[in-house]
C-alpha cells in the first residue's frame, strides 16, 4: 500500500510511510512525533493504521482517511496470540511480531476511549473507505455512528496496488483539496 501511494502521488505530494511500533501507544507517540516534525495535510491508515489515525486526527487537527478501519483490535488479536510475520517488508528487516496478552490489554484500553475526541466538527473531517469484499473488518455501521463520509470500493481488507491507486489515492487527493485551507 505504501509504495502504491508513493507512486500515485509522485511529483505532487510527499507520502510518509513509517514502520510503526506494534504497541499502539508507542505507535501513536511516533505518529504524533512525525506530525509535529513534518506537518502533514492528511493522515491515512488501513486497518489498525486507520484505528490509530482516527484517534489522532482530532488531537493533531488533521483530516484523516480511514481504509477498512478495525475498531475492535482486541477481537482480532485474541484469536491470533503467538508469533507472526508482518505482511509488508519493514525497513529494519524485522518481520517478526508477537501477539501477547499485554498487547491485547493495551488495545483494549485504547478501544474504550477511541471515540472520545470525536466532535461534531470532526464528523466531516474523517472519511472512511470500505472494501465491499472485506472478510475481516465490518465496521462501516460503527464508523457512521461517529462520522459522515463513508465510501465503498470493490475490494477486500488489504487493498491491492491497483485499488490503492484507483480508490485510496483519489479520495486522499480529494480530501487534501477540500481541506487545503484548513
Region locations from a protein language model:
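Active-site catalytic motif of lipid deacylating hydrolases and related acyltransferases
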Residues: 1-37, 157
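A generic structural signal for well-ordered alpha-helical segments
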Residues: 9, 35, 56-57, 143-144
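Glycine-rich phosphate-binding loop signature in dinucleotide/nucleotide-binding domains
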Residues: 36-39, 179
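Residue in the alpha/beta-hydrolase core beta-strand immediately N-terminal to the catalytic nucleophile
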Residues: 41-44, 63-65
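Gly/Ala-rich beta-loop-alpha elbow adjacent to hydrolase catalytic centers
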Residues: 44-53
Amino acid at each position: 500500500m505504501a509504495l502504491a501511494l508513493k507512486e500515485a502521488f509522485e511529483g505532487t505530494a510527499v507520502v510518509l510511510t513509517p514502520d510503526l511500533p506494534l504497541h499502539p501507544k508507542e505507535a501513536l507517540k511516533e505518529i504524533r512525533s512525525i506530525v509535529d516534525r513534518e506537518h502533514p495535510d492528511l493522515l491515512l491508515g488501513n486497518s489498525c493504521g486507520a484505528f490509530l489515525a482516527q484517534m489522532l486526527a482530532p488531537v493533531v487537527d488533521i483530516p484523516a482517511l480511514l481504509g477498512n478501519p478495525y475498531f475492535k483490535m482486541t477481537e482480532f488479536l485474541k484469536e491470533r496470540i503467538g508469533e507472526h510475520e508482518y505482511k509488508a517488508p519493514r525497513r529494519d528487516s524485522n518481520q517478526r511480531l508477537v501477539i501477547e496478552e499485554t498487547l491485547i490489554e493495551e488495545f483494549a484500553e485504547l478501544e474504550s476511549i477511541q471515540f472520545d475526541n470525536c466532535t461534531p466538527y470532526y464528523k466531516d473531517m474523517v472519511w472512511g473507505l470500505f472494501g465491499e469484499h472485506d472478510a475481516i473488518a465490518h465496521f462501516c455501521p460503527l464508523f457512521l455512528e461517529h462520522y459522515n463520509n463513508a465510501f465503498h470500493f470493490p475490494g477486500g481488507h488489504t487493498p491491492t496496488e491497483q485499488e490503492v491507486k484507483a480508490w485510496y489515492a483519489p479520495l486522499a487527493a480529494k480530501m487534501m483539496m477540500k481541506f487545503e485551507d484548513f
